[in-house]
Amino acid sequence: MSTVISRDGTAIAFERMGSGSPLILVDGALCSRAFGPMPKLAPLLAQTFRVYMYDRRGRGESADTRPYSKEREVEDLEALIGEAGGSAFVLGLSSGAGLALEAAASGLAIEKLAVYEPPYMVRPADSARHAKANHQSQLERLLAAGRRGDAVKYFMRDMVGVPAIFVFMMRFMPGVWSKLEAAASTLPYDAAIMGDFSLPEQRLAAVRTRTLVIGGGKSEARLRAAVEAAARAVPNAQLRTLAGQTHNVKPEVLTPVVTEFFAA
C-alpha cells in the first residue's frame, strides 16, 4: 500500500499493479480496495494496464478531512493522476462514475473515460422522488445519531431500492455488514456527488474526454434510462450495453469491453 497527498493534505491510500498505460479505478458507494468489485476487477485489468486502485477518502486506509465537498474528491483523483505520470485512463462504477464524470468536466488530465451506470434519475417519477428526499441530509442525521446500520439500510432501501428482506438478510452475511457499517460515514459523500440525482446536462456537456458509457442489459429500467441519457449528454460519447448484466456487473464481462476502448 502507498499513499498520495491530496491538495488539502489528506493522505489517499492506493495500490498499483500491472504494467502499461495507467488506469485509475473509481469505486461507488461503500466500496474500497478491499471490498466491492475492484478486488476482482483490478487484477484482470492489470494484465493489460498499470492499474491504480485506491480507497476514496474516509474509506479503508485513506484519511479524511472535514468539511467534505465533492471538489475534494476530484482533487484526490487529480493527485492520483499526478502519481500515475500526469495523465491516465479512468474507469468509474456507479456513483464513482458520477465522480469520474465530474472530474472530467473539471478538466482533469483523463486520456479516456469509461463509466458504468452512473445512477442518475431521468424518468420524471424517479427524479421527483429523489429530489424531494434530500438523501444527504437524511444520511447525515442518522450518522450524527450514531446509527451507522440505519444509514446503510436507508441507502440500500430508499436510495438503491433493494427489497427490505434482502437488506435484512445482509445483516447475517459474515464480514459483509460490518464492512458496510465501517464505510457508512462516507454515504453522504456519494449523495453529495450525485446531488438530487438529476442528470447534470450542462456539466456533462463540458466533458471533452473521449468517453464510453456502459450499462447492463438486465439492469433496472431507471438505470438503463440513465445510461442512455448520460451517453447523449456527453459530447461524442459511445454507448455500450452488456447483454445479461445488471448493476453488479461481472468483472470478466466488463474487462474486455473497457480494455478494447482504452487500447484503441
Task: Name the predicted role of every residue range.
Residues 235-264:
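Catalytic active-site module of serine/aspartate enzymes centered on a nucleophile-bearing elbow/loop
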Residues 165, 175-199:
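Hydrophobic, aromatic-rich cap/lid helix
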Residues 207, 213-215:
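Short beta-strand/loop motif that positions the catalytic acidic residue
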Residues 3-63:
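Conserved HGGG/HGGXW glycine-rich cap/lid loop of the alpha/beta-hydrolase fold
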Residues 198-208, 231:
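Serine-hydrolase catalytic core
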Residues 87-126:
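Conserved hydrolase catalytic core segment
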Residues 220-226:
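Conserved alpha/beta-hydrolase "acid-adjacent" motif
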Residues 43, 52-91:
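Active-site loop/oxyanion-hole signature of alpha/beta-hydrolase fold enzymes
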